[in-house]
Design a protein with these regions (language model features):
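Active-site-adjacent helix/loop patches that line small-molecule binding or acyl-intermediate pockets
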Residues: 1-25, 35-42
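Structured C-terminal helix/loop/strand segments within mature extracytoplasmic catalytic/sensor domains
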Residues: 26, 30-151
Length: 151
């Protein structure tokens, strides 16, 4: 109720029912929630894929779970062709719509990619934002595969 400046639960639910307002809720405040950066998520994925984050069995389990991502409308949408494996995880809270993934083209080294966004609205489905996440991932992975990007 504090986040919506409401005095009753009914007032809070009424305020949150409007997707025209992007509330500044405590869930968006890094001091009160788990928070990370796209760079750190890419480092974590690189450590996982190289076997430096977990035990061998833990690594295989984590990779298998990420390969079974059930939402194909974000990063996966940037790679609609066969011969490409995308293992990822979405993260959505209100206006925050993120996804991290490892994209692997057959015969090539895997590429970690993280796309973090903040939408203007908190609608549960925002196809244009999801498609943009896929497009940004495609552009980033294409550049990394070209060998022209220097860290």
């Amino acid at each position: 109720m504090r986040d919506t400046d409401s005095h009753t639960t009914a007032e809070a639910f009424a305020a949150l029912a409007s997707n025209d307002d992007a509330w500044t809720v405590a869930a968006y405040d890094a001091a009160y929630a788990s928070a990370t950066t796209a760079r750190d998520m890419n480092r974590l994925l690189a450590a996982l894929w190289s076997g430096n984050a977990l035990s061998e069995s833990g690594t295989e389990l984590a990779k298998a779970l990420l390969h079974h991502q059930v939402w194909p409308h974000r990063i996966r949408s940037g790679f609609p062709h066969t011969g490409v494996a995308v293992a990822g995880k979405t993260g959505t809270v209100g206006i925050i719509r993120n996804e991290v993934a490892v994209v692997t083209f057959a015969g090539e080294s895997p590429v970690a990619v993280a796309v973090f966004t903040r939408a203007a609205r908190a609608d549960p489905a925002l196809p244009a934002v999801d498609a943009a996440i896929g497009e940004v991932a495609r552009i980033a992975v294409t550049e990394l595969r070209s060998g022209t990007v220097v860290d």
